[in-house]
Curated annotation (Swiss-Prot):
PROSITE patterns: G_TRME. This is tRNA modification GTPase MnmE. Signal peptide: none annotated. GO terms for molecular function: GTP binding; GTPase activity; metal ion binding. Belongs to the TRAFAC class TrmE-Era-EngA-EngB-Septin-like GTPase superfamily. TrmE GTPase family. The gene is mnmE. Its cofactor is K(+). Its EC number is 3.6.-.-. It comes from the Bacteria.
């Protein structure tokens, strides 16, 4: 792959902002060694050997001192000459050193530019580059382990295996088109259809695994809603395992939206407690209800909590407040305070909806609710689950659509040229995942979300 940046040398602080014992500045590019040598006024240490050096300012005064590490191309993270300067971690000295590197010929790295260069130089594919950011942003050990698997190539290997099958299929189709004089009709003999169906099944298998990886990365947005004093905040506290929300007997205690990031059975959850739904003249409470409706509209799953003691019909409440805002499949009915009614905590069906009775205060039925939430998400990660993103699933969905088109053209019309075109589009869509086929704006969007020093 052509490296558009091969003539420039970039520099950036690679450690998080703030004070610390050590601060790392990274250089990458053809002049990295030359710039580092001018900064230290001494020969650089051997490749991959740590060397202690002083860092000098323009007037010859010492700015700082620390460790220098050199990684010659192509055996470096970016595939270029790379130098890492490990000095003291104060922001003042780090910025001063960075400014000195700019004086010596380096330019400021853009967000994700080190990883972009690694991708362009064939050191990693797009999935592995994204996995670096996902590993840094991981919110659970399971997500971190899955990101490491993607970084090590688990996801890429699966995609490349399917791509090889797809290319093999395209070769058969192209041969059938290019050699029509052959006595055997390769399009109609069943072999190409069998190969096509095998590719479809392979994509489906990767999709299933990728969906688990996407859930690990992006989690589930779960909103708790209901009438005042139904026990919404108690339920949030029970699920979160801490007293995060204020709980009183006074209706309308929660007037704003409260977010809590938790993990349920390993699934990252953003749990949202909302203001009680009721008619009110209170301006502040009205605003809280407006925000609650907004959260409900964006929820992956709504837990509609009602008080079993009050004899409320939860579906009537749902229709009154947000029937226009939520699909039935995203709604779960939670009958709370079963300890006061003598009912057992159980899961049942209520007019086609999942219905769960709990006691949030006594934590009766809470584990059953947790299991129901993760089951609703379809979350059941395996040991080899890899991290995945929405764009990966979108690419596989388009791949399946093109494969379905190819199957239709083959089975119904026996139209070789149209089959070939659909297969080409399928390969391009699947190739977007690893970067084998990528538009520049896609690359810019992906790497632009990275931190500067990556």
């Amino acid at each position: 792959m052509n490296n558009m940046h091969s003539q420039t040398t970039i520099a950036a602080i690679a450690t998080p902002p703030g004070r610390g014992g050590v601060g790392v500045i990274r250089l990458s590019g053809p002049k990295a060694y030359d710039i580092a040598q001018k900064l230290t006024q001494k020969n650089l240490p051997e490749a991959r050997m740590a060397g202690f050096r002083k860092f000098y300012d323009t007037d010859g005064s010492i700015m700082d001192e620390g460790i220098v590490l050199c990684f010659p191309n192509p055996h470096s993270f970016t595939g270029e000459d790379v130098v890492e300067l490990q000095g003291h971690g104060g922001p003042v000295i780090q910025n001063a050193l960075l400014g000195r590197l700019f004086e010596l010929g380096a330019i400021a790295a853009k967000a994700g530019e080190f990883s972009m260069r690694a991708f362009e130089n064939g050191k990693m594919d797009l999935v592995q580059a994204e996995a670096i950011a996902d590993l840094i942003d991981a919110t659970s050990q399971a997500a971190a382990r899955s990101a490491v698997r993607s970084l090590q190539g688990a996801f890429s290997t699966k995609i490349n295996t399917v791509l090889e099958k797809l290319i093999h299929l395209r070769l058969h189709v192209e041969a059938a088109i290019d050699f029509p004089e052959e006595e055997i009709d390769f399009l109609a003999d069943g072999k190409i259809l069998a190969l096509l169906e095998d590719v479809q099944q392979s994509v489906h298998a990767v999709q299933t695994s990728a969906r688990q990886g996407q859930l690990l990365r992006e989690g589930l947005q779960v909103v708790i809603a209901g009438k005042p004093n139904a026990g919404k905040s108690s339920l949030l506290n029970a699920l979160a395992g801490v007293e995060r929300a204020i709980v009183t007997d006074i209706a309308g205690t929660t007037r704003d939206v409260l977010h809590e990031k938790i993990s349920l059975n390993g699934l990252p959850i953003t749990l949202t407690d909302t203001a009680g739904l009721r008619e009110t003249g209170d301006i502040v409470e009205k605003e809280g209800i407006r925000r609650a409706i907004k959260e409900i509209e964006q929820a992956d799953l709504l837990l509609l909590v009602y008080d079993l003691n009050q004899g409320d019909d939860p579906l009537k409440l749902a229709q009154e407040y947000f029937s226009e805002h939520i699909e039935p499949r995203r709604l779960m009915l939670i009958g709370n305070k079963c300890d006061l009614t003598g009912q057992s905590a159980e899961i049942s069906d209520y007019q086609g909806f999942r219905h769960i009775t709990v006691s949030a205060k006594q934590e009766m039925g809470v584990q059953g609710l947790v299991d129901a939430i993760t089951a609703h998400a379809g979350f059941h990660p395996e040991e080899d689950t890899f991290i995945a993103r929405t764009r990966h699933l979108d690419a596989m969905k388009r791949t399946q659509l093109y494969l379905a088109e190819a199957r239709e053209q083959l089975v119904i019309f026996n139209a070789g040229e149209l089959v070939a075109e659909s297969l080409r589009l399928a390969q391009n869509a699947l190739g977007e995942i690893t970067g084998d086929f990528s538009a520049d704006d896609l690359l810019g969007k992906i790497f632009g979300s990275f931190c500067i020093g990556k």
